[in-house]
A protein has these predicted regions:
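Non-transmembrane amphipathic alpha-helical segments
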Residues: 24-28, 59, 86-89, 93
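Heptad-repeat coiled-coil alpha-helices
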Residues: 34, 41, 58, 62-65, ...
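Short intrinsically disordered terminal tails
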Residues: 1-2, 63, 67, 126-130
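Amphipathic alpha-helical binding modules
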Residues: 81-130
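Residue-level recognition of alpha-helical structural elements
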Residues: 10, 38-42, 75, 100-107
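Short, solvent-exposed, charged loop/turn and helix-capping segments
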Residues: 55-80
């Protein structure tokens, strides 16, 4: 297998991982919007899928040493708005992938960060209910 073929295979895996992240993120957003039970699980699944796609993305495009800045944490942020913002970041990451892999990676890391923040808020809220 030559380098070009290996790169093509890696890019296909990134595409599939980004699709899965999108699917799980959409499911989490739908679940949150409709007031489903245990929303923290759906958000966690989306977070894990985004984290995995971020790992594949960084390996595929040689960005392992990049450490994008962390977005400013919003006080009293609502999980639903964080998940919506992460969906927008994921969309931008997917769009920028072919144009600027570094910029796309930054948006992808923002997606992960916001999902992680939403998950943390939901976990705390769930613990308070118990």
């Amino acid at each position: 297998m030559d380098a070009a073929e290996e790169q093509r295979m890696l890019e296909e895996k990134v595409s599939k991982a980004l699709e899965e992240a999108r699917t799980k993120l959409d499911a989490a957003l739908d679940h949150l919007s409709n007031g489903g039970t245990e929303p923290e699980k759906k958000v966690w699944w989306a977070e894990e899928a985004a984290e995995y796609s971020s790992l594949l993305y960084s390996l595929t495009y040689g960005l392992e040493d990049e450490d994008p800045p962390v977005p400013v944490r919003k006080r009293n942020a609502e999980p639903t708005s964080l998940v919506k913002e992460s969906a927008e970041s994921l969309r931008r990451a997917t769009e920028l992938r072919g144009k600027s892999s570094l910029e796309g990676y930054r948006y992808l890391r923002t997606t992960v960060y916001k999902l992680r923040q939403a998950h943390h808020i939901l976990e705390k809220a769930g613990a308070k209910k118990r």
